[in-house]
């Protein structure tokens, strides 16, 4: 199962959390680090050995026309849309135009996972892919019970993905931090530092 993951934020965290919660006996490949550009996705695909049950490929865009190329390369069985925000907005006339570009990842994907809280993405997905695709709204599952909204939504996406794959909800208690993404570190004088340098 090839999984394409896109969104303004959360691509790498969702990818890493899926990888960290993979059931025993399921061989999984994931694109390294944040390899989500045209070149990064192509390099990731070349690393797949072929006997994996799940291959997680990030797809990031910054310009119009990029997602059509990524969709042809990745050809996902499952498309995951993590979020919709203002990243790379300067290259698009409107949020809707950027959203339409991102939605191209799911053009031929039989199954689509998204979070209903992100508009206009959720409405556009339901309208554009109403037929011929199975849509799964992650807002309808419990998630991991995280205190911050971004982590909770990411956990709901991960849980929904595993349910789509016919697996039970994962145990989020064993998750390890993803480097430079809300990573909590010990500081001096009994302080805590939150390293979100990547974002």
Regions found by a protein language model. Give the residues of each.
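Short intrinsically disordered, low-complexity coil segments enriched in acidic
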Residues: 1-7, 55, 70, 142-143, ...
